[in-house]
């Protein structure tokens, strides 16, 4: 670190929905000459993922504010105090010029200590319904950014930071116009798979005549790949040229861009990526998401004709088969174009710009 190099601390952890947008901003800031340090939980996915990206880490142990039983509630004051002390030590070691909170349990104690020690805090909320931590910290932060308009009062709508390759895909008009033959369907269950999709999609495809069936790439999750194969075989469909089963997809930009239609959950990052690429989507929100935020995430596109929303309780093989029969490449292309028009492909640059501006304003205030 040089004497003039500025430092960003990113606070994020727990799930990919918090960590991956944080990584996108971290890499952009590094490219602009910033030193970046990550604050996370040693038990979270960030503890293994972030160091692989060459970003040093500081750690805070904290399990969240929402109650998980009587013992957890009684222990909350002690755990919060300990996490605040760990956050204070980390901030003193790193001496950041600005702190970016991207969500996750540790953001609460670390965000409080950031403000109490006079350091500037920038918050980013990825979901359409803000979490408890960001609702509290939004009142204390210098700038509040949101991925979905209206998620927090008096916030700036930047969109969700995404990987560069997703924002650089060919426009949907050109992609869809260049295709012929069967529709291309991508089914994405996430890294853990989605049992409801794994069960319903094979049965729905079996109800279609062979010439009506799309070509399918079905990402199942490593633990579910054998069960999914059995589901397709039970439906009378063999896995081969028209159905490809994969446990994981490394290059999501290409997978989205090669599809005419995606059937998937509606986590914040998934919705942002689908809009950025511009691809038609049928969203089936995870019904047990906190505050049912996946439904409102999907509604952002669905209410403007840029996607279709089907609740899991309503999803059936018959419903899905009937809907697929009514789709054409032209109708899906129109949906994809509307989706692309609602994207915020420059979100990563915008969040980075805000962080730099806040750091600069804070430095000027000290002079």
Swiss-Prot record:
This protein's record includes keyword Cell wall biogenesis/degradation: yes
Main location, first listed in the record: membrane
Record key words, sorted: Cell cycle, Cell division, Cell inner membrane, Cell membrane, Cell shape, Cell wall biogenesis/degradation, Glycosyltransferase, Membrane, Peptidoglycan synthesis, Transferase
GO molecular function, one term: undecaprenyldiphospho-muramoylpentapeptide beta-N-acetylglucosaminyltransferase activity
Reaction catalyzed: di-trans,octa-cis-undecaprenyl diphospho-N-acetyl-alpha-D-muramoyl-L-alanyl-D-glutamyl-meso-2,6-diaminopimeloyl-D-alanyl-D-alanine + UDP-N-acetyl-alpha-D-glucosamine = di-trans,octa-cis-undecaprenyl diphospho-[N-acetyl-alpha-D-glucosaminyl-(1->4)]-N-acetyl-alpha-D-muramoyl-L-alanyl-D-glutamyl-meso-2,6-diaminopimeloyl-D-alanyl-D-alanine + UDP + H(+)
Entry-linked Gene3D superfamilies: Glycogen Phosphorylase B
Cellular component GO terms held in the UniProt record: plasma membrane
GO terms for biological process, alphabetical: carbohydrate metabolic process; cell division; cell wall organization; lipid glycosylation; peptidoglycan biosynthetic process; regulation of cell shape
Biological role: Cell wall formation. Catalyzes the transfer of a GlcNAc subunit on undecaprenyl-pyrophosphoryl-MurNAc-pentapeptide (lipid intermediate I) to form undecaprenyl-pyrophosphoryl-MurNAc-(pentapeptide)GlcNAc (lipid intermediate II).
Protein name from the UniProt record: UDP-N-acetylglucosamine--N-acetylmuramyl-(pentapeptide) pyrophosphoryl-undecaprenol N-acetylglucosamine transferase
Record gene name: murG
